[in-house]
């Protein structure tokens, strides 16, 4: 609920309260929210026929003919395993008081604001097991079932509830006033926040405090300037380094407001140049999983390991000596760590043409990040400990964005619009403090963040043609591969350092793209005609790739690499085989023996994840009926909407837009909705 109260002519009180309660129930799989789907990925068609006469039937390798070396996973692995129920309750509330202070000076005002959010999630889960049955063929041709295990009662398990709570408050003085053609404004704001139950040291809340100042000026809405400064404090740093100062400034010039622009204003109706530069700070690292890294080094006693005599302690006596507990250094801290910083600049141009029917915008940005927290990989191992985090990293990012929007009308009833935006993003790691490597191409420094270390795939091995082909391309003999007994259809990799063998020194970060697209585009189109409204949105991305996980690349292998996984249909249809030795097959020869060679990290498994997607489509009709006036009904709209309707992509393993699509995850769903909107 939202409530706005005019307490006096100069005082306004606003309150907003929202809450949510939801309950969910799902089978207990032990594999997370997508457990049922993951079971399907890991299953094989010969692992289980499912339920037969109420019995869960599983195949077995224990047959006289020994024709089944393994059965693989079962798509019914979750059956009878129990359940998990969650109950989630959230509360969000905020209140704001605004007070005009014109009696002090015109344009001065004051406001205070506070918000409070809390959440509580309880879990009820119980596990169980059911008897399984294995079919056994009898001499007379009938099938008997051998029983394994017993049906067990549900066993309820304890799981701690999840809690969340935070509050935020601010107090600010605002000033805005016009002096003829001069417009000025200023802001002075204090804010403070606290987050309870953080992931690290959950008993100690996280706290932030800051002061913000802002001043703006414009003359005739033609020349504009703004200056901001932030002074923020974080608990993550030692006294003396806890607070950081972060200034920013922006400038703008609307050229089309100048007198000399009038002759061409009918063509270029609006033109604005703008420039922004600012320094921002970041105090979170490692997903906020680490805190207080400036404090004294922590020590730990590992008593459980001492029982087995493999922990840290002192031995007294001979043979069956007594272990006396002792502490060991759990990590090294650094009192000199401070804020990560980013200097951001943006240069932009806005231009409208043909009486604002065509609106365009162009932005170029550059960001230089310094003092990035990381551990020094160049430190020698003789130190005997992992170096502490320090402000050692540096990175650059840059790119541009173009936006085009066209709005027009044909006749009295038909209006249409088209909008296109295109973005380019690039970055480079300037300093990473990586461990020394034998080859330059092994470093992430100088390359895009997220570049992959992988072998360069050459071709599938053919004993008659590959050695000669390799020598023709690279001028040297084909190197020794990761396995000595190479078979036709196995992967052949390129010897990047020309030492005659393939090893970790041939893994390079210079190939392919990353999980983040370099180019992204969007297209919005729509029209309205005699009560009908039609709109659609297309999105696209390219110069992006995914390195598919072992479940997607290696048949019969699950996430534990126990060789008990699934055989997916596209593996069967796109694998090199002696019967179909396709040199362009997606998959090499299926093998367990040479799996370390064929399924190693390489460019073969880096798949193009570009896509074009119809994100949403809506067809609506706006009614204008006589009875609406009697009911004081201003609008009545019936709309049919669709979401994620079409996707065109060469990446068929999962949703190409998701970074998690390189491994089994919940699939993308199409959504259709029918809505009726009433306005009074």
Feature-to-residue mapping (PLM):
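Transmembrane beta-strands of outer-membrane beta-barrel pores
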Residues: 19-23, 92, 114-122, 190-198, ...
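Extracytoplasmic gating/loop element in the C-terminal half of outer-membrane beta-barrel translocons
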Residues: 76-77, 541-638, 642
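Short loop/turn motifs that connect adjacent beta-strands in outer-membrane beta-barrel proteins
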Residues: 10, 28, 100-110, 123-125, ...
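Conserved small-residue
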Residues: 29, 289-307, 390, 407-513, ...
């Amino acid at each position: 609920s939202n409530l706005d109260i005019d307490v006096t002519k100069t005082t306004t009180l606003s309150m907003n309260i929202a809450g949510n309660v939801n309950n969910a129930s799902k089978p207990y799989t032990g594999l997370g929210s997508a457990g049922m789907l993951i079971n399907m990925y890991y299953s094989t068609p010969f692992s289980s026929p499912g339920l037969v006469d109420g019995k869960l039937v599983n195949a077995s390798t224990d047959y006289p003919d020994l024709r089944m070396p393994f059965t693989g996973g079962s798509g019914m692995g979750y059956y009878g395993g129990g359940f998990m129920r969650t109950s989630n309750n959230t509360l969000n509330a905020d209140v704001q008081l605004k007070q005009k202070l014109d009696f002090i000076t015109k344009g001065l005002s004051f406001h205070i604001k506070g918000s409070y959010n809390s959440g509580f999630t309880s879990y009820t889960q119980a596990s169980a097991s059911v008897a399984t049955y294995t079919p056994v063929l009898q001499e007379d041709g009938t099938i008997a079932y051998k029983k394994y295990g017993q049906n067990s009662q549900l066993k309820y398990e304890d799981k701690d509830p999840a809690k969340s709570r935070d509050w935020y408050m601010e107090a600010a003085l605002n000033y805005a006033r016009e002096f003829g053609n001069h417009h000025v404004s200023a802001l002075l704001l204090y804010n403070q926040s606290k987050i309870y139950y953080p992931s690290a040291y959950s008993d100690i809340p996280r706290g932030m405090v800051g002061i913000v100042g802002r001043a703006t000026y414009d003359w005739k809405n033609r020349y504009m300037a703004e200056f901001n400064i932030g002074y923020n404090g974080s608990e993550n740093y030692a006294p003396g380094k806890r607070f950081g100062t972060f200034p920013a400034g922006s400038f703008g010039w609307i050229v089309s407001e100048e007198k000399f622009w009038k002759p061409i204003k009918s063509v270029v109706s609006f033109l604005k140049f703008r420039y922004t530069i600012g320094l921002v700070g970041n105090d979170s690292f490692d997903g906020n999983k680490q805190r207080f890294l400036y404090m004294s080094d922590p020590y730990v006693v590992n008593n459980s390991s001492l029982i087995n005599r493999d922990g840290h302690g002192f031995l007294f006596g001979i043979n069956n000596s007594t272990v006396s507990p002792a502490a060991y250094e759990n990590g090294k801290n650094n009192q000199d760590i401070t804020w990560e910083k980013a200097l951001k600049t943006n240069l932009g141009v806005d231009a409208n043409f043909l009486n604002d029917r065509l609106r365009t915008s162009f932005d170029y940005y550059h960001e230089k990040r310094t003092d990035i927290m990381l551990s020094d990989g160049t430190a020698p191992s003789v130190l005997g400990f992992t170096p502490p985090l320090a402000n050692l990293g540096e990175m650059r990012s840059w790119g541009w964005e173009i936006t085009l929007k066209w709005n027009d009308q044909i006749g009295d009833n038909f209006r249409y619009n088209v909008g296109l935006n295109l973005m380019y993003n690039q970055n480079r790691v300037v300093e990473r403090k990586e461990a020394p490597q034998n080859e330059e191409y092994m470093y992430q420094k100088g390359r895009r963040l997220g570049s992959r270390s992988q072998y360069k795939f050459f071709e599938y091995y053919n004993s008659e043609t590959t050695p000669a082909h390799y020598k023709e391309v690279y001028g040297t003999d084909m190197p020794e591969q990761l396995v000595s007994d190479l078979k036709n259809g196995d992967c052949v990799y390129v010897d990047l350092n020309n030492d005659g063998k393939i090893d970790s020194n041939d893994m390079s970060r210079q190939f392919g793209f990353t999980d983040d697209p370099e180019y992204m585009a969007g297209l919005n189109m729509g029209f309205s005609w005699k009560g009908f409204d039609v709109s659609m949105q297309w999105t696209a991305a390219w110069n992006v790739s995914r390195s598919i996980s072992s479940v997607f690349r290696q048949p019969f292998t699950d996430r534990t690499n126990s060789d008990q996984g699934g055989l997916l249909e596209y593996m069967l249809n796109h694998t090199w085989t002696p019967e179909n030795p396709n040199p362009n097959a997606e998959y090499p020869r299926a093998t367990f023996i040479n799996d370390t060679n064929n399924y190693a990290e390489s460019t073969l498994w880096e798949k193009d994840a570009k896509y074009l997607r119809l994100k949403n489509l809506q067809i609506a009709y706006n009614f204008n009926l006589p009875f609406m006036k009697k009911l004081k009904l201003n609008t009545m709209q019936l709309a049919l909407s669709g979401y994620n309707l079409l996707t065109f992509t060469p990446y068929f393993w999962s949703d190409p837009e998701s970074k998690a699509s390189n491994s089994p995850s919940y699939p993308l769903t199409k959504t259709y909705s029918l809505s009726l909107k009433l306005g009074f």
